[in-house]
Regions:
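Short, low-complexity N-terminal intrinsically disordered segments enriched in polar/charged residues
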Residues: 1-11
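Structured, amphipathic secondary-structure segments that form assembly/contact surfaces
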Residues: 4, 14, 19-120
Length: 120
């Protein structure tokens, strides 16, 4: 359940290009919990502005995934690789925490936040 959803959503959130970001974020927004919509839209708009302005692409390679069912969170650690056009611009080890809330049996995203990166 949660792991598959987190895996799918993190790729919509981070595996993007200036050409795909609009459709990916529209799709992702359908899975945002109504209570988190306003804050999340701001977060997505900021990402979109940077990606389009600098013509950046990114890819997130998951190395480790941990689920906390009680808290409805999934922690994803991995390597975020940046490109400008076809040229690699660097990579960073990153950790993201996704928090979910079930609504009518469907998981909705409450939050995607950068977490502490213990797995370097």
């Amino acid at each position: 359940g949660l792991q598959q959803h987190a895996n799918y959503f993190i790729h919509l959130y981070l595996d993007l290009t200036p050409e795909t970001i609009d459709s990916q974020y529209v799709h992702l927004a359908q899975f945002i919990h109504p209570n988190a919509h306003i804050e999340f839209k701001k977060q997505l708009a900021e990402h979109e502005k940077v990606v389009k302005k600098l013509h950046l692409s990114s890819r997130f390679d998951i190395k480790h995934l941990t689920t906390n069912v009680a808290k409805q969170t999934v922690t994803l650690s991995g390597r975020l690789v940046f490109y400008q056009g076809p040229s690699p611009q660097g990579a960073k080890d990153k950790t993201f925490v996704m928090q979910f809330s079930n609504k009518l049996g469907k998981p909705f995203i409450l939050k995607i936040a950068e977490g502490n990166n213990e797995n370097k």
